[in-house]
From Swiss-Prot:
Record InterPro entries: Arg_repress, Arg_repress_C, Arg_repress_C_sf, Arg_repress_DNA-bd, WH-like_DNA-bd_sf, WH_DNA-bd_sf
Keyword Amino-acid biosynthesis: yes
Gene3D superfamilies documented for this protein: 3.30.1360.40, Winged helix-like DNA-binding domain superfamily/Winged helix DNA-binding domain
Pfam families tied to this protein: Arg_repressor (PF01316), Arg_repressor_C (PF02863)
Family: Belongs to the ArgR family.
Entry-linked SUPFAM superfamilies: C-terminal domain of arginine repressor, Winged helix' DNA-binding domain
GO CC field: cytoplasm
Pathway recorded for this protein: Amino-acid biosynthesis; L-arginine biosynthesis [regulation]
Localization of this protein: Cytoplasm
Function: Regulates arginine biosynthesis genes.
Keywords: Amino-acid biosynthesis, Arginine biosynthesis, Cytoplasm, DNA-binding, Repressor, Transcription, Transcription regulation
Gene: argR
Name assigned to this protein: Arginine repressor
Principal cellular location given in the protein's record: cytoplasm
């Protein structure tokens, strides 16, 4: 049996990555992950404790999710803690940040500029689209960005 802190950490990560429309689906996912003694009432308490809410997504489906406010950066947050994920395709790098941090991180990346392979950035609230100066060197540019936040 895995410990309750490990369960709660896994539970929150699961809610961030997966889409669940019912508590039964969450129970099934936790049991499949190796957690014992999981039932609907326990999941209900965990949802309440974590502050999770059931809300509609863009497809009008009701899903459980953690509120964005839980990730609001504070004045003492190191910049590297504000960057949650960095990924790319063949033409663009996408950087996911804590809510409210994207413009700060984008401004930092803009200051680095073309010398490090960054042509420009567009930032929303929690997502940055970064265009490299050379799409053939996009992996190299992504590595430079990752090294800034490790």
């Amino acid at each position: 049996m895995k410990q309750s802190t490990e369960l709660m950490t896994f539970f929150k990560a699961l809610l961030e990555k997966e889409h669940f429309s019912s508590q039964g689906e969450i129970v099934e996912a936790l049991v499949n992950a190796g957690f014992n003694n999981i039932n609907q009432s326990k999941v209900s308490r965990m949802l309440s404790k974590s502050g999770a809410v059931r809300t509609r997504n863009a497809k009008q489906e009701m899903l459980y999710c953690l509120p964005a406010e839980l990730g609001i950066p504070i004045i003492t947050s190191p910049l590297k803690n504000l960057v949650l994920d960095i990924d790319r395709n063949d033409s663009m790098i996408v950087i996911r940040t804590s809510p409210g941090a994207a413009q700060l991180i984008a401004r930092l990346l803009d200051s680095i500029g073309k010398t490090e392979g960054i042509l420009g950035n567009i930032a929303g609230d929690d997502t940055i689209f970064t265009t490299p100066t050379n799409s053939k060197k996009i992996q190299e540019t992504m590595n430079i960005i990752k090294n800034l936040f490790n």
